[in-house]
A protein has these predicted regions:
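Bacterial N-terminal signal peptides
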Residues: 3-16
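Short hydrophobic/aromatic-rich beta-strand segments that constitute the beta-sheet cores
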Residues: 64, 92-94, 148
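Conserved metal-binding segment of the jelly-roll/cupin
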Residues: 121-141
Length: 156
């Protein structure tokens, strides 16, 4: 079974290098949580979350993310995000101003935190939509983890 999961994960994550396609894809929460186990290892060896692009579509992309620490404050000028919480709890901070902002790529800004933002607790089953241009940051509960599915939606 483990070998099958590894092969499945490798085939899904290999889509990171593939061209955008017109397709329909469905995942069960169990499938995503199995893949997230590999993200745990990636997160342990990184300063950021463990993430993997699941699919690149003509009009969007899907990402699976596992966090074992707070995220940086971020803002995407050309993409909106939809988060679907699979496991764990975190506080989503939105709006406000990014402290010490740095442009990390065209249209991508990161910073240490958000000042004057609105805080919303997220838990399993919650869905959050963050429009392009809105600062946002995930803050984890002490010692907690957070697994979520992301849909990246480009501005048109």
């Amino acid at each position: 079974m483990m070998k099958l999961c590894v092969v499945l994960a490798a085939s899904i994550l290999s889509s990171m290098a593939s061209a955008q396609t017109a397709t329909a894809v469905a995942y069960s929460p169990d499938q995503l949580l199995q893949l997230a186990q590999q993200m745990r290892e990636q997160a342990k060896n990184s300063k950021e979350a463990g993430t993997g692009i699941l699919e690149k579509h003509l009009d969007s992309a899907t990402i699976l993310a596992f966090r074992d620490r707070d995220g940086k404050a971020e803002l995407h000028q050309q993409f909106g995000d939809v988060f679907v919480v699979l496991q764990g709890t975190a506080t989503l901070v939105t709006g406000g101003t990014i402290a010490s902002p740095t442009t990390t790529a065209p249209g991508e800004i990161r910073g240490a935190s958000i000042e004057q933002g609105i805080r919303k607790k997220l838990q399993e089953g919650d869905i959050a939509h963050i429009s392009a241009g809105v600062p946002h940051q995930l803050i984890l509960d002490a010692g907690g983890t957070f697994t979520y599915f992301v849909v990246k939606i480009p501005l048109k």
